[in-house]
Design a protein with these regions (language model features):
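Aromatic-lined carbohydrate-recognition surfaces of secreted/lumenal glycan-active proteins
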Residues: 159-179
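Glycine-rich, charge-decorated loop segments at or immediately adjacent to ligand/cofactor-binding or catalytic sites
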Residues: 88-96, 175-186
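Hydrophobic anchor at the start of a short beta-strand
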Residues: 77, 164-166, 185
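Acidic, His- and aromatic-enriched active-site or binding-groove loops in soluble protein domains
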Residues: 106, 149, 183-193
Length: 193
């Protein structure tokens, strides 16, 4: 669950009760200039989901350098992988998924000793690839299907490696589009009221 700072939690968050965990996403583009674990703890942050990899590259040196302070404060850390599904095609998506998960697993081994505090996560996106691939391929039925197949392959690989299904970390739009039967026990909101 994400806790919206300084506001009364929305009704759907309150429904989880006092046992709910509240967390943040920290990636290279949304990191504060300095991580202050005591400020996070004071604001009831229980966990932080950290982007360790994106596509075929490692991506978050900033947070990795500060993981020790966060862990010693009692904040749980969970790695996530931001996939580059838009680089996959029908004939190579399994190979591409394997390569991405090999890099992600290597980073989990390196920074978590292979045992993260929480289950590794996959950031499920629309297939938008930034400046080089500005048009989401998910706008077509074929693109949507490939996007889902790619992410399912990522999930299969992670389950084989870690013995648990990964968390799927995504925006509300994807939950409605792709995960209508998903467990509502996890809720993430970004930039919404």
């Amino acid at each position: 669950l994400w806790k919206t700072s300084g506001k009364e939690p929305p009704a759907q968050v309150q429904a989880f009760g006092s046992n709910a965990l509240f967390g943040l996403d920290i990636s290279g583009w949304n990191s504060p200039k300095k991580i202050k674990a005591d400020v996070f703890k004071k604001n009831s942050v229980d966990f932080i989901v950290i982007k360790l990899t994106q596509g075929m590259s490692t991506s978050n040196k900033f947070i990795v350098d500060q993981m020790k302070e966060l862990r010693s404060s009692g904040i749980l850390l969970a790695p996530y992988h931001f996939s580059s599904a838009q680089h996959s095609r029908e004939n190579n998506f399994k190979r591409r998924a394997q390569k991405e998960m090999d890099i992600f697993s290597r980073e989990i081994d390196k920074h978590f000793g292979g045992k993260p505090d929480l289950t590794p996560s996959i950031d499920f996106e629309s297939g938008h690839g930034g400046r080089r691939h500005p048009k989401p391929y998910g706008l077509t039925v074929r693109g949507h299907n490939l996007n889902v197949r790619f992410h399912l392959e990522l999930a299969r690989i992670l389950k084989r490696r870690y013995g648990k299904r990964p968390l799927v970390y995504t925006a509300n739009w994807a939950r409605g589009s792709y995960f209508s039967k998903a467990d509502p026990g996890l809720l993430a909101e970004f930039g919404s009221e």
